[in-house]
């Protein structure tokens, strides 16, 4: 059985939660490897919706091991609330185990305060932060002053590291941003309470993963957000603070890259984006409004309206390259039903320069680009009942075939509705 990485090919919100939930049936271990509670994965099982921000989507299945890896930044209050909510609704199976890496960094109150203060102070275009403290937490990690789960669980060490951080952060908050200082003792007391509630979940998750692999148990690595929010490969500076590409599944969980066998790229049948940043195929018209309305395009974390547009294959081809994607899972194909004509962006044009496979990193050049479109005929048939490719209208099949030809990667799954069962499965990546 293979180990499989699932990543987004766009700007997040591609429907990874549903696909991970589906693949979790075949995996024995499901591991998150980056991001924090700035991303939300929406699952619909038997008509009931569940939104998870930190806990892996596989938590709804029996007999699983769910891991929050060292590459994730953890807000302990959010983690506790998710655990208690799932247990209260009877959705945390007693035979499924949850572990949090001792090396995962902790989001502190001053991270959230700094996040919001910086965004407020920015002149001109905002980054579009969720205000959850993700960026500042990763900054502390890189600056080697961050507080990890293992530090939080050691009362003496936590007090020492907290004192150093509060002194520095209060200087920045008060002197640079004119914000009120945070209170060290209040934070200490609050987080010591959290520590006791999460202590039983803390573990060396790298060792757990190694043991499970040696037993031949298939592992699913769950990415958050999407390739073009990646700190290295995204539309910088309108990106997140972590690496969202498949290669980080290794670093963010503590297993070797040779253990990763398949990479599944999740691609929405059109394109959406939350917050600021370039979006060449954005539709500020009736079609864009229709995609937003029919697709229910509101952020699972922020509730913000998602910007909508035609499918941008430049983004997808770029994602295929940087993540080494071996199979595509197409989501929300049903949202396109009823559109007479569909457009695919197959390149960017700037003067005499054509960019068919990668996004220009220079924001000035990107701003000057125009999308190059191909047109395809749409369909009117309701496809939500389709369970195999032959059930789809011919034009829907042609649309999927064109995505394959443009990327050189096979479509292995098609989602035709929000429910777990509203899916066409063409290949099981765990059988590779």
Curated annotation (Swiss-Prot):
InterPro entries: Adenylosuccin_syn_GTP-bd, Adenylosuccin_syn_Lys_AS, Adenylosuccinate_synth_dom1, Adenylosuccinate_synth_dom2, Adenylosuccinate_synth_dom3, Adenylosuccinate_synthetase, P-loop_NTPase. SUPFAM superfamilies: P-loop containing nucleoside triphosphate hydrolases. Pathway: Purine metabolism; AMP biosynthesis via de novo pathway; AMP from IMP: step 1/2. It is an enzyme of class 6 (ligase). PROSITE patterns: ADENYLOSUCCIN_SYN_1, ADENYLOSUCCIN_SYN_2. Its EC number is 6.3.4.4. One of its GO terms (biological process) is 'de novo' AMP biosynthetic process. It is found in: Cytoplasm. Mg(2+) binds at residues 13, 40. Keywords: Cytoplasm, GTP-binding, Ligase, Magnesium, Metal-binding, Nucleotide-binding, Purine biosynthesis. Substrate binds at residues 300-306. GTP binds at residues 12-18, 40-42, 306, 332-334, 415-417. Binds 1 Mg(2+) ion per subunit. Plays an important role in the de novo pathway of purine nucleotide biosynthesis. Catalyzes the first committed step in the biosynthesis of AMP from IMP. This is Adenylosuccinate synthetase.
């Amino acid at each position: 059985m293979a180990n499989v990485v699932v990543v987004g090919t766009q700007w997040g919100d591609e429907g990874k939660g549903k696909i991970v939930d589906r693949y979790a049936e075949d995996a024995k271990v499901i591991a998150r490897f980056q991001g924090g509670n700035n991303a939300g994965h929406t699952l619909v099982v038997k008509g009931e919706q569940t939104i998870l921000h930190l806990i892996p989507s596989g938590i709804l299945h029996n007999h699983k091991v769910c891991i929050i890896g060292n590459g994730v930044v953890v807000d302990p209050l959010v983690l506790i609330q998710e655990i208690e909510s799932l247990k209260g609704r009877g959705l945390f199976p007693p035979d499924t185990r949850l572990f949090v890496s001792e090396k995962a960094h902790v989001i502190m109150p001053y991270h959230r305060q700094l996040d919001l203060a910086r965004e407020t102070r920015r002149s001109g275009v905002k980054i579009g932060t969720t205000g959850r403290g993700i960026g500042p937490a990763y900054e502390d990690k890189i600056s080697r002053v961050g507080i990890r789960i293992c530090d939080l669980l050691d009362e003496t060490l936590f007090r020492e590291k907290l004192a150093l951080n509060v002194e520095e952060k209060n200087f920045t908050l008060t002197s640079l941003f004119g914000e009120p200082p945070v209170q060290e003792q209040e934070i200490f007391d609050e987080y010591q309470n959290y520590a006791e509630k999460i202590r039983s979940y803390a573990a060396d998750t790298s060792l757990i993963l190694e043991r499970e692999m040696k037993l031949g148990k298939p592992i699913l690595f769950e990415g958050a957000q999407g390739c073009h929010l990646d700190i290295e490969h995204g539309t910088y500076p309108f990106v997140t603070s972590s690496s969202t590409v498949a290669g980080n599944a290794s670093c963010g969980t503590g297993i070797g890259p040779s253990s990763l066998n398949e990479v599944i790229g999740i691609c929405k049948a059109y394109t959406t984006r939350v917050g600021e940043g370039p979006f060449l195929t954005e539709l500020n018209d009736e079609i864009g409004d229709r995609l937003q309305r029919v697709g229910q395009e509101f952020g699972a974390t922020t509730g913000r309206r998602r910007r909508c547009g035609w499918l941008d294959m430049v983004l997808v081809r770029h994602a295929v390259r940087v993540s080494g994607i071996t199979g595509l899972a197409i989501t929300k194909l049903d949202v396109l039903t009823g559109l007479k004509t569909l457009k695919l962006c197959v390149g960017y044009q700037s003067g005499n320069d054509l960019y068919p496979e990668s996004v220009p990193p220079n924001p000035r050049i990107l701003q000057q680009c125009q999308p190059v479109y191909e047109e395809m005929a749409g369909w009117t048939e309701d496809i939500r009942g389709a369970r195999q490719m032959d059930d789809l209208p011919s034009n829907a099949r042609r649309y999927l075939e064109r995505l394959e030809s443009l990327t050189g990667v096979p479509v292995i799954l098609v989602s035709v509705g929000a429910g777990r069962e509203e899916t066409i499965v063409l290949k099981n990546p765990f059988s590779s």
